[in-house]
Amino acid sequence: MNTLQAIVLAVIEGITEFLPVSSTGHMIIASSFFGIAHEDFTKLFTIVIQLGAILSVVVLYFKRFFQTLDFYFKLLVAFIPAVVLGLLLSDFIDGLLENPVTVAVSLLIGGLILLKVDEWFNNPNAAETSQKITYLQALKIGLFQCIAMIPGVSRSGASIVGGMSQKLSRTTAAEFSFFLAVPTMLGATVKKCYDYYKAGFELSHDQVNILIIGNVVAFIVALLAIKTFISFLTKNGFKVFGYYRIIAGIILLLIHFFIHPLTII
């Protein structure tokens, strides 16, 4: 992987990580289009640059992120299902990650759901602040997030739909999804990095520089993406993301079956 390819992937990570469109699907398309090699460092890169995206949430919501102790316990409750199922289903999930068709189908199904989510969960009494989320609601949102263990589903999409199903407003559901991303993505990143460390994987000086560049780019782009997304949600719904996912899923299937087989990076 060269620096330009790293920047491209980091931009995609920053844009798609917090939008309900699946970062995995976009990484597949980008790696195919730009000829990015399917190698260990590429896999590690796509994991580590999530740290830059995570930092954008902490910076953007700095005051709100450091709220009451009760808020952290709610995040913990929402995070626990991902920890439990992630450990129990690790091998099964890794198997799914090898299949780009799974990603494409997930994009299509998720797109159809997003076309209807505003109609299903249009609640005039929706909670407008994450402080009003109950522990039971937090747990249910965490369970919804686990659906995103299926590649292509989108972690943010699953948790946002989960939040709206619990009578949260669109923006509140999205913001709680951002908060929940911090422990979830941080935990997943640490685990994967530890796995690479145990396997004896070593980084070259150039690779370290590429990781630094990737994180900086992902951080900046994610900041802009989150601000734009929240601003968009205050006036619009999820239909545009639904149509976008359907188009992306169709493109993936067409490329995979009629141009050349795709691989997961």
Curated annotation (Swiss-Prot):
Disulfides per UniProt: none
Subcellular location: Cell inner membrane
Topology versus the membrane: Multi-pass membrane protein
Keyword vocabulary terms for this entry: Antibiotic resistance, Cell inner membrane, Cell membrane, Cell shape, Cell wall biogenesis/degradation, Hydrolase, Membrane, Peptidoglycan synthesis, Transmembrane, Transmembrane helix
UniProt GO cellular component terms: plasma membrane
Keyword Transferase: no
Predominant cellular place of this UniProt entry's protein: membrane
InterPro entries, alphabetized: UppP
Organism superkingdom: Bacteria
GO molecular function: undecaprenyl-diphosphatase activity
Transmembrane segments: 18-38, 41-61, 69-89, 95-115, 133-153, 171-191, 210-230, 245-265
GO biological process: cell wall organization; peptidoglycan biosynthetic process; regulation of cell shape; response to antibiotic
Protein EC: 3.6.1.27
Catalyzed reactions per annotation: di-trans,octa-cis-undecaprenyl diphosphate + H2O = di-trans,octa-cis-undecaprenyl phosphate + phosphate + H(+)
UniProt miscellaneous comment: Bacitracin is thought to be involved in the inhibition of peptidoglycan synthesis by sequestering undecaprenyl diphosphate, thereby reducing the pool of lipid carrier available.
Role played: Catalyzes the dephosphorylation of undecaprenyl diphosphate (UPP). Confers resistance to bacitracin.
The family this protein is said to belong to: Belongs to the UppP family.
Name under which the protein is recorded: Undecaprenyl-diphosphatase
